[in-house]
Amino acid sequence: MAPPKHVIIIGAGAGGTATAARLAREGIKVTVVEKNNFGGGRCSLINHNGHRFDQGPSLYLMPKLFEEAFEALDEKIEDHVELLRCHNNYKVHFDDGDKIQLSSDLSRMKPEMERIEGPDGFLRFLDFMKESHTHYEGGVEMAIKQNFETIWKLIRLQYVPALFRLHIFDFVYSRAAKYFKTKKMRMAFTFQSMYMGMSPYDSPAVYNLLQYTEFAEGIWYPKGGFNTVIQKLENIATEKFGARFIYEAPVAKINTDDKGKKVTGVTLQSGEVIEADAVVCNADLVYAYHNLLPPCRWTTNTLAEKKLTSSSISFYWSLKRVVPELDVHNIFLAEAFKESFDEIFTDHKMPSELSFYVNLPSRIDPTAAPPGKDSMIVLVPIGHMKSKTNEAEDYTMIVKRARKMVLEVLERRLGLTNFIDLVEHEEVNDPSIWQKKFNLWRGSILGLSHDVLQVLWFRPSTQDSTGRYKNLFFVGASTHPGTGVPIVLAGSKLTSDQVCDHFGVKVRPSAITSSKRTYAPEDSKSFIWDIIWFLLIALFAATLVLFIAFPQYSEVNQTAASYINNLLPAAFRVPVANLSLTS
């Protein structure tokens, strides 16, 4: 009997851990190498004197995708993780002192919507939710659960109606503006694009699906912190399926055999070489192509030009007492809403007026802080680093300015004084720290951006995008399907299925039955007809462009039609008189 295939996974983040568990379940030997002495990547914890902070994600959204990640391992998530539902979604604070409580309880939303939007405000809110539901259902099934390995998968005619239903070519803010009359509600229902690290003015409207999942499925919190989910996946991978995790093992390079068009394993910074039949990279994709692989034109030209998401200054404050004015999730929005996003995403700097997010996990999970105290996280979105080094930015001064601005807003909008006196201890992540700690390219906390030309087939592939290495795969925020923990977990299925297919391993069906929907298998005849139709449409479009762009072939007084006509064999030419410019 042949020995099992060996796969090395670089990085023990959400994607790497879930992929390790999936592959190990299929009998593949899996070794995970992680640079840090902890797992989870950005889904890791900071602890200090009884205070616990989620270093990265704190909003447990799209719960079905989490359930599916555990079901694929023949497990139920409720047997491993205790989920706590937030009574309120957010408390949103505006610059004029007004605030609104967003809740998935419609009986509470109705008076809030009518107070700000007028008598028909609640009905327009329901219409917005109806459209967002379409985005959610279509977006998950088409964009998240499908792997666009070739352009042919993208151009299938069955997807054309979906592109319009999902408003791919419209933007989050402009769609919200069709339903909400007031600036306050437009802001309250578009700031969620920051979960994708994007401006609502540039983010494809399909990402309004985030608002739907918040209201329809609720916002949850895993007891013990977000890292609990990843830790449980690791436990399943190691204890149930025999995967191996090695910590404090940073990778120096991915070893390659260019003649054989394959990778052969990794070399650790310690000098140790670990051989493998395939490598899955869960390290930041842009970092990996620039630092772990030989240079190539695609990396230096194509990848280097792709847009990045924002970074953040994140404060982790241990508070002396509970602050009752704050809820679990709090949003403070700048009056100069659009201008602040322009400064983040166009100028790549900290905005002059801050919008920021405040999370108090201790409000929903008392184990996050000592009795009578709060653990408080403040996330301030700012532009990513302008270069690989932080030479252009003085983050010591930028952090100092951000702290001062946050405190001023908190005190003014909450009616408090000397808020800084409540802070017993502070830890900070700025863009340079995000880059150093997690190898995030230019400190971009959510990887590559998700504009129209950086999603689906246009996003870096789950299999080596350069075409050089047939056994090199990727999982994580910057590859398809995209960023966010639930989306990355869904992506782990696409990647692991691809690896199994590469080895000729058939994925066993889950022992856990689920009602989740899946697309029907591809019909090969339908696929061929899609290609034929695409070629015909492309030919028609090319001809139309010629007729519009080149109305006259001036040297011989010909039209574009007559010029093309002359290129045809004589038997196929149209009589010249029918194509003449003059009567």
UniProtKB/Swiss-Prot annotation:
It comes from the Eukaryota. Pathway: Carotenoid biosynthesis; lycopene biosynthesis. Residues 1-20 form the signal peptide. Keywords: Carotenoid biosynthesis, Membrane, NAD, Oxidoreductase, Signal, Transmembrane, Transmembrane helix. One of its GO terms (cellular component) is membrane. It is found in: Membrane. Its cofactor is NAD(+). It catalyses: 15-cis-phytoene + 5 A = all-trans-3,4-didehydrolycopene + 5 AH2. It holds the Pfam family Amino_oxidase. It is a single-pass membrane protein. Gene3D superfamilies: FAD/NAD(P)-binding domain. One of its GO terms (molecular function) is oxidoreductase activity, acting on the CH-CH group of donors. Its EC number is 1.3.99.30. The chain crosses the membrane at residues 531-551. Its main location: membrane. GO terms for biological process: carotenoid biosynthetic process. InterPro entries: Amino_oxidase, Carotenoid/retinoid_OxRdtase, FAD/NAD-bd_sf, Phytoene_DH_bac_CS. Phytoene desaturase involved in the carotenoid biosynthesis pathway. Converts phytoene into 3,4-didehydrolycopene via the intermediary of phytofluene, zeta-carotene, neurosporene and lycopene, by introducing up to five double bonds into phytoene. Belongs to the carotenoid/retinoid oxidoreductase family. This is Phytoene desaturase. It comes from Phycomyces blakesleeanus (strain ATCC 8743b / DSM 1359 / FGSC 10004 / NBRC 33097 / NRRL 1555). The lineage of its organism: Eukaryota, Fungi, Fungi incertae sedis, Mucoromycota, Mucoromycotina.
